[in-house]
């Protein structure tokens, strides 16, 4: 460390997956990392720590040739569980899909064994989004999305929190007009 101020990498979305990657040159100013979000295909990026510039080295191809990430939008919202705990929800939709009671929504969750459902890019999911669906991931307790305690608070005698979190997320999405109970 050279004593300079901290710097945070600028990510395009508030809900994403990022990880450091390998670089065979250990004496370099380049940080290589992987990045993807609900709207951005998996990418390998070189970040120059001196100039603060980035270069996309590789991005997952989306077959069909019609994909444009600017046609989709994602967000992170927080539902309040029965015990007052804030539960994150990652949401993605096509920009032409409005949040109304008539909009179909697929809510997905997995809260067990500490497994985390990252907000990742899926070409299969694009088919739903292009047909007017909203897709949401409820990051319920039982996974480790918010750390080890998040996992502990969703297992054994606290397992019911996983299901109560999912219900709270469903109610939040209905109350905030993303969809309705009929969907």
Regions found by a protein language model. Name each.
Residues 27-36:
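Short beta-strand elements that form the blades of beta-propeller/WD-repeat-like
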Residues 49-53, 58-183:
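Cap/lid segment of the alpha/beta-hydrolase catalytic domain
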Residues 4, 39, 84-86:
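Coil-to-beta-strand transition motifs
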Residues 6-7, 55:
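A structural motif specific to WD40 beta-propellers
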Residues 21-27:
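Structural signature of eukaryotic scaffold interfaces centered on beta-propeller domains
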Residues 7-21, 61-68:
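Conserved blade-ending motifs and adjacent loop-strand segments that build the rim/top face
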Residues 39-46:
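Structural motif
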Residues 1-4, 49-50:
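Short loop/turn segments that connect beta-strands within beta-propeller blades
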């Amino acid at each position: 460390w050279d004593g300079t101020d901290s710097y945070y990498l600028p990510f395009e979305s508030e809900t994403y997956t990022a990880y450091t990657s390998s670089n065979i040159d250990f004496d370099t100013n380049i940080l290589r990392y992987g990045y993807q979000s609900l709207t951005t295909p998996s990418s390998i990026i070189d970040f120059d720590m001196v100039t603060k510039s980035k270069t996309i080295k590789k991005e997952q191809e989306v077959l069909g040739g019609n994909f444009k990430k600017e046609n989709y939008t994602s967000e992170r919202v927080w539902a309040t569980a029965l015990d007052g705990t804030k539960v994150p929800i990652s949401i993605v939709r096509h920009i032409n899909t409005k949040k109304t009671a008539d909009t179909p929504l697929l809510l997905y969750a997995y809260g067990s064994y500490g497994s985390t459902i990252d907000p990742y890019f899926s070409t299969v999911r694009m088919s739903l989004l292009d047909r007017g669906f909203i897709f949401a991931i409820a990051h319920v307790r039982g996974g480790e999305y918010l750390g080890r305690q998040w996992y502990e608070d969703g297992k054994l005698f606290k397992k019911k929190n996983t299901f109560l979190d999912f219900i709270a997320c469903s109610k939040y999405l209905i109350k905030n007009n993303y969809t309705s109970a009929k969907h």
